[in-house]
Amino acid sequence: GWKDWLKTAGGWLKKKGPSILKAVVGAATQ
């Protein structure tokens, strides 16, 4: 169900979020 998907997406974001943010900020400040 969508709750399982949400849980998976939440866990993925917790893991990948910080590095994605760093990449976006790094690209924006160049």
Swiss-Prot record:
**GO process terms (BP):** defense response to bacterium
Q: Does the keyword Transcription apply?
A: no
* Cited InterPro entries: Poneritoxin
Q: Spell out the GO cellular component terms annotated for this protein, sorted alphabetically and separated by semicolons.
A: extracellular region
Localization recorded for this chain is:
Secreted
What keywords is this UniProt entry annotated with?
A: Antibiotic, Antimicrobial, Secreted
- Its signal peptide is none
Q: In which tissues is it expressed?
A: Expressed by the venom gland.
Q: What does the record give as the function of this protein?
A: Has activity against some Gram-positive bacteria and S.cerevisiae. Has a non-hemolytic activity.
**What is stated as this protein's family in its record?**
Belongs to the ponericin-G family.
Q: What is this protein called?
A: U1-poneritoxin-Ni3d
Organism of origin is Neoponera inversa (Ant)
